[in-house]
Each structure stands twice: as C-alpha cells, then as structure tokens.
C-alpha cells in the first residue's frame, strides 16, 4: 500500500489544499494529512476543528472514506512522522517559484536525512495559485466573501468564528 503524507497547518483548509489532496489520491492508496502543531503559533482553528473540516471535505466533496484519508497531528520532524506511519512519499504543493525554491531546499534536507522518502511536488491549479490561508483569514476577519477560496463547510466555520469574535469585540 502506498501511503502519502501531506503536511501543513491547514488553518483554514483552502480550495488550493483540496486540489493538492485530490492529486495525492491519484498517486497513493492512502493519504495521511498531518497538521503541524506549533506551540508558538496561534491558530484560528483548533486541531480538532481542522480535523473535522478536513474529514468532512474528504467525505462530502472528494467521496473519500476513512480507509483512504487519515488526519493526524505532528510536532516532530516531518520525516520522523513519515517513517512512523510508513509513508512512501511526502506531498508538497507548489503555487509559484518562491514555493519551489523553499520546497526544493526542504526536499534536499529531507533527502539527506531520509533517503528512502521521496518528495512529490504537485502544482497548484491556476485558480489556486493566489490562495493562502493567511489571506483567507484576513478577508474573512473583515467580513469579506471567501466562498471562491474555501469549501462551504470551511466558509461556514470562518463566518461563525469571526461573527463570534466581532460580537465579543475582539476580531483578530
């Protein structure tokens, strides 16, 4: 069984992430989405909320069951988590040349530390190249329409999150 590991913060999950996830299922029998947990980084959505959002997208939009999609956390080196779950390769999405430069550097370092793990780069779709979780959060925090950038369940979750923040007078 070929297992792919797709890591990120997914805060929130965007249509760009989903396109990369779809491409991952063409290459792998099972995809493990690994949400990076960083103590110093304040997330908008909790780990549990992100798991729910990703799992729901897998089921509802991609028609992928729990036998092919698993969501986990990691706070270690990515290669250590990949080895732990038996991953055959790492999936990385590329939006532009800046991503490529960074990801090639990371793939090179990972290749030295874990030569048995390959990194597979999947290019973002034309419509997904401009999407970043940071921009989506900023637009949503100001009450903007993010429906073109995220799936419906994430759009609802963002709306609820920021509506609550605005009602309490603390928009981040």
Curated annotation (Swiss-Prot):
One of its GO terms (biological process) is coenzyme A biosynthetic process. The keyword Cytoplasm applies. Substrate binds at residues 9, 41, 78, 92. The record marks 17 as: Transition state stabilizer. SUPFAM superfamilies: Nucleotidylyl transferase. Keywords: ATP-binding, Coenzyme A biosynthesis, Cytoplasm, Magnesium, Nucleotide-binding, Nucleotidyltransferase, Transferase. ATP binds at residues 9-10, 17, 93-95, 103, 128-134. Its cofactor is Mg(2+). It comes from the Bacteria. Its EC number is 2.7.7.3. GO terms for molecular function: ATP binding; pantetheine-phosphate adenylyltransferase activity. PANTHER family: PHOSPHOPANTETHEINE ADENYLYLTRANSFERASE (PTHR21342:SF1). Belongs to the bacterial CoaD family. Homohexamer. HAMAP family: PPAT_bact. This is Phosphopantetheine adenylyltransferase. The lineage of its organism: Bacteria, Pseudomonadati, Pseudomonadota, Alphaproteobacteria, Hyphomicrobiales.
